[in-house]
Amino acid sequence: MKSIVFVALFGLALLAVACSASEDAHKELLKEVVRAMVVDKTDAVQAEERECRWYLGGCSQDGDCCKHLQCHSNYEWCIWDGTFSK
């Protein structure tokens, strides 16, 4: 009888250790996923800042617009600058 109780308690202790190790691994995985999401958002913001604005895209200066476009002074959107080239 004592040995059965001892084995049952020992089994429960092993199960608790295994669950706690699994929980730690789960927490680490969650941290990695969150880090990856934050890095991806940071990269996306940087990419948006470098891209030019297309036709009728909002702008504040000519440098914001793509090639052959200029920033319209009244409406602040990119319009064609009247040039042709390849």
From Swiss-Prot:
Keyword Secreted: yes
Coiled coil: none
Propeptide feature: residues: 22-50
Top-level taxon in the UniProt lineage: Eukaryota
Signal peptide limits: 1-21
Disulfide bonds: 52-66, 59-71, 65-78
Expression by tissue: Expressed by the venom gland.
Places the protein is found: Secreted
Example GO molecular function: toxin activity
Entry GO terms, CC: extracellular region
Entry's free-text remark on domains: The presence of a 'disulfide through disulfide knot' structurally defines this protein as a knottin.
Name the record gives this protein: Omega-theraphotoxin-Hhn1f 3
Organism: Cyriopagopus hainanus
Highest classification ranks of the organism: Eukaryota, Metazoa, Ecdysozoa, Arthropoda, Chelicerata
